[in-house]
Curated annotation (Swiss-Prot):
Name of protein: Inner membrane protein YfeZ
Principal location listed in the UniProt entry: membrane
UniProt-listed Pfam families: DUF2919
Topological domain ranges for the Cytoplasmic compartment: 1-18, 80-89, 137-149
Keyword Repressor: no
GO terms for cellular component: plasma membrane
Spans through the membrane: 19-39, 59-79, 90-110, 116-136
Membrane topology: Multi-pass membrane protein
Locations listed in the record: Cell inner membrane
Membrane side Periplasmic: residue ranges: 40-58, 111-115
Amino acid sequence: MKSTEFHPVHYDAHGRLRLPLLFWLVLLLQARTWVLFVIAGASREQGTALLNLFYPDHDNFWLGLIPGIPAVLAFLLSGRRATFPRTWRVLYFLLLLAQVVLLCWQPWLWLNGESVSGIGLALVVADIVALIWLLTNRRLRACFYEVKE
């Protein structure tokens, strides 16, 4: 059932709220290590050099894949969110938790001796903005808690 809280263009043909465009960008931000992994795998010759450029310490690369798991699951389940409503609701909290982990990750690396860089600062700012958006966007929360009638 369509709610009058949101504009009609925010609904698809089945009467479900469409996920906001910014949601997909936040998922890409959260799954950034996964994206790098796919790009490195696709570019066979330069894959190792690319991974070494962004992750000189290979342990950080493998640990960086962990907070991206909820984002990858959200990509995969977004088309089937009506089929798996409980999983979809839990995924919202996992995305929030992953965003907090990613927000703390970079400063933790800095405290452990990694040099501060422009890319690191940009990622921290982007993580702060993403967390605020995930917490405050009413349409996004409504997408995760749609009521079936």
